[in-house]
Amino acid sequence: MSMMSFMMRMACKKNDAKRDAGLVYPDNVVRVENISYGPHKMNVLDVYRPQTTEAKLPVIVSVHGGGWVYGDKELYSYYCADLAKRGFAVVNFTYRLSPENKFPCHLEDTTLVFDWVKKNADKFGMDTEHVFAVGDSAGGHILALYCSLCTNPEFAANFDFKPVENLLPKAIALNCAVLDIDTIDGGMSSSSMKLMNDVLPKNKKKEYLPLVNPIAHVNEKFPPCFIMTCNEDFLKEQPETFKKKLEDFGVPYKYEFYGDEENLLGHVFHLDMKNEVGRLCNDEECDYFKSFLV
């Protein structure tokens, strides 16, 4: 493991513990925990539903962030429970991390989760006609690649696993996400790109680097997007070229920039259940998804 990945894990763990300190799990959300969705030890997920209904609900699949080297479903439990309160069945999963596992493991595990959703929809009251997804930071990167796996046959041909048939998300939310590797501040010397040294197979870096750039694989079939960033996000410039690419292909999107001089908001602020603007952002994303419930 590189020093960059080690420092990433230590810093994120400390920040996440501070973020969630004192939070109490809501008593109006039911959670089914630690369901296996694949062959690997880390292939586990939780399902969240509002306690007030047993009806089939629209689905949100949450793809966690963490620079491809950190994170799991436990760190997103309060966030996903909060989404469920808005009337969704929420799927929160852990995927294999780098550097112990190499790309495309993150993408393969995400594909397995969507396959699990399709196969277990009736058991867990999930409406597969209305599946949505959210991803933040590296999770947004993985989610964008998954959507291209579903919509771009040329991109999909690079992998020996296939997307779930007829389960492209109706819309997605890309939150403080890595969307255009070529425009990351600092380029190849940036922290994000240094992490790629731990993510990509050593003998396939040259082959895989173009594959891991989400903007390169967008086409007219890419799903509608809610794209957000904020004033203190180190990836706040990422949406600019991505929005232009969506416009070129006629893909609908909604863009929101949060924060101002009196309200400084950092990377993935929406995960903080104590942050009023973060909760507003989550409200607006869920309202965006609900606009597709027709």
Predicted regions and their residues:
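Alpha/beta-hydrolase superfamily serine-hydrolase fold, recognizing
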Residues: M1-V294
